[in-house]
């Protein structure tokens, strides 16, 4: 299974195009354009597993830095400020990592 089994390759490409320049990544815009915001809880858990590179069950800042590359390998890395903003947007319990439930809440907010 690949990420394009869940999301359209065209939607992913369009979402990445919108944030190709550093410091232009806006999570909610990315979620909408890529189609993530329309996904069910089950589909988002599948997406979360793709993003969770080390399969630890949560995303840390190191994994978030490569968030865009999980959708397309040649995409850019998130900047430090983008990574921090993404963490702040989802880390509801302040433990420095994002669980699957927190990810789902962020995408659907």
Swiss-Prot record:
Residues binding Ca(2+) 2: 91, 93, 95, 97, 102
GO function term, MF aspect, one: calcium ion binding
CDD domains: EFh_parvalbumin_beta
PROSITE patterns per the UniProt record, alphabetical: EF_HAND_1, EF_HAND_2
Sites bearing N-acetylserine, chain numbering: 2
Keywords: Acetylation, Calcium, Metal-binding, Repeat
Keyword Repeat: yes
This protein's name: Oncomodulin
Organism: Mus musculus (Mouse)
């Amino acid at each position: 299974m690949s990420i394009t089994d869940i999301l359209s390759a065209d939607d992913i490409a369009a979402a990445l195009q919108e944030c190709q320049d550093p410091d232009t990544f806006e999570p909610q815009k990315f979620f909408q354009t890529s189609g993530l915001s329309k996904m069910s809880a089950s589909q988002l858990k599948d997406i979360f597993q793709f993003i969770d590179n080390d399969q630890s069950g949560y995303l840390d800042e190191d994994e978030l830095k490569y968030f865009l590359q999980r959708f397309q390998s040649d995409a850019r890395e998130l900047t430090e400020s983008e990574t921090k903003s993404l963490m702040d947007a989802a880390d509801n319990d302040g433990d420095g990592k994002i669980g699957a439930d927190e990810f789902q809440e962020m995408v659907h907010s």
